[in-house]
Amino acid sequence: MTYQQAGRVAVIKRIAGWLVFIPALLSTLISIINFVYLYSQKGTGVNAVMLDFIHVMTDMARFNTPFLNIFWYNSPVPNLEQGLSAGNIMFFIIYMLIFVGLSLQASGARMSRQVRHIREGIEDQMILERAKGNEGHSREQLEEKIVLPHHTIFLQFFTLYILPSVIGVLGYFVIKLLGIMIQG
């Protein structure tokens, strides 16, 4: 892949990363809000006040964001009692798409940095080639020699493999803690 092609691929990867990340993040957040809203039961004392606050905030967010109705009505709500149900699997897939989008964006940003560095290197080399006179290489000859490797998102280890696991474990403990607080 030439460095001009790499520049275009880098822009496409960055745009695709944001186009995957933003809807996946919105859907996941709305799924979690709906989960807390649906599985919070009426309680007494301080818990009742907290649950009423959660219900009011959820209703207010839903009312004030009609442009997100596609997410409010279609985002899968996880159910801890059902195990591998369709809703839980869809929630997990959408959750993982957050990190796929981040990895795409990071891969595109890395390619963009490399292309910028190569472009600056070619400009520097052209100054030296002009100093050589007729013996120097042309810009086209220098560009033909440059071949960039393909960048895959699967090499983004932290973003794609570690971060989802850490956030998932923390989320599991928070949900369990909320479940304990709600029950008593």
From Swiss-Prot:
Name of the gene: yfeE
UniProt-annotated location(s): Cell membrane
Topological category with respect to the lipid bilayer: Multi-pass membrane protein
Coiled coil: none
Keyword vocabulary terms for this entry: Cell membrane, Membrane, Transmembrane, Transmembrane helix
Pfam families cross-referenced by the UniProt entry: YniB
One cellular component term from this protein's GO annotations in UniProt: plasma membrane
Top-level taxon: Bacteria
The protein's name in its UniProt record: Putative YfeABCD regulator YfeE
Signal peptide start-end: none
